[in-house]
Amino acid sequence: MSTTGDSANREKAAAFLSRLQATPVSHFIAGQWQPTDGRECFENIEPAGNTSLGQVISGTTEDMDAACEAAADAFPQWSQISGQERKRILHHFADLIEERAEEIALVEASDCGQAIRFMKQAAVRGAANFRFFADKAPEARNGLSLFQPDHTNYTLRQPIGPVGIITPWNTPFMLATWKIAPALAAGCTIVHKPAELSPLSATLLAEISERAGFPPGVWNMVHGFGEIVGKRLCEHPAIKAIALVGETSTGSQIIAQGAATLKRVHLELGGKNPVIVFDDADFERALDAVVFMIYSLNGQRCTSSSRLLIQNSLKEKFLAALIERIGKLKVGHPLDPDTEVGPLIHRGHFDKVMSYMALARDAGATIAAGGYRPEDLSSGNYVAPTLFVDANNTMRIAQEEIFGPVLTAIGFDTEEEAVQLANDTAYGLAAYIWTKDTGRSMRLAQRVEAGMLWVNSENNRNLPSPFGGVKMSGIGRDGGDYSFDFYMETKNVCIAHDSHTVPVIGA
């Protein structure tokens, strides 16, 4: 049933979306929106009812070449602008994001199906990303002074050049700002290739860039498909690095496509992240975190804790409480303020997630909650929040990234067994530990194979901290100076003192 808030949000969203539906959504290259007449388009389908949100220009190799060349042409000017001026422009960009916060939230929720209660934070987090890296822009080039007798060594950090940014369809606005802000703060120019399944927030970002004060060509954006424009972005010789948030298989392709031009790559990829709950955990807080970290954002979050490793002495009580909580989750339209779980991004992904229900049964697991599409939401890509029990870690439901509101619960007895289960996967992005035993948490922090580990917390983000995975979950780190390590080159300068004697030969 539609609520008053739901109706108001739908009316506002329709008004914002009408502008984006009036003509095909186009590319932004060298400070100009590209002509749409006569161009091949693809349909942008929204996930709540599988209806059209309009047409999007399908980018070509020529479009991507133009964007890469524009970024290369703009790089000399942008890279030499002072850090203070970049700081000013990036803060202005953040101001402009905040001015359009409601539009961003409503468009994002409509385009990718994330619940509006979470997408209200999209602009807040996006602006925070820009402000954080804006403040770091003046110090981005700072290096080190390295002592050596008879010589003075110091390092310089310089922007690597034009870079490619490839972003996914889950929370696309925030993730785009997370990748783009440090690149611009470092002095790089960018070519943004957004996911074709959620193109609208990238369009809003490009619109904001028009007003922010960037020289033409600093910010470029090309819509389209990975096998065409994404591939060309990775191959183009003007592009010096590629930053991706996406699937592990896509990361492998990007490495191969960029190999001929020796592209630097930063890959933030998939995960099958464990949440390990010991019997001494704070029961209610652990329960809250388990529910939040798999069912919020529709389970379409790289750091989702999709494997619950629960100590057997607590298992029966915890699973009973978990099943009760799952039954209370509100599944509904993403623009309904009460909705906690919205639709999956597109029908193909819905079919993939639903296929794991049969896989679970065939493997001997039990579906303790969910496992179906709600009948009253049959026009959209909705999956009822699902829990698999009676599972073991060899099952596909415990090894593969399902990327939906689907949790697999597995029991363990000892700390050693918990570590073995946690590490028995190809992935290593994140892990969560719930225990009151400080010594145990410190031991597991050393032994669990993950790029990030939270103890007695959900995935709290601290912008200066490193973000990234190990194993098949990625290469490199984001956050603070870790981002600058990727977007910048380090140059060593060695100056001899008068006391230095040059070796003499042939005299």
Regions found by a protein language model. Give the residues of each.
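Residue-level signal for inorganic ion chemistry
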Residues: 50, 86, 108, 130, ...
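Structural signal for hydrophobic packing residues in well-ordered secondary-structure cores
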Residues: 75, 79, 94-101, 105, ...
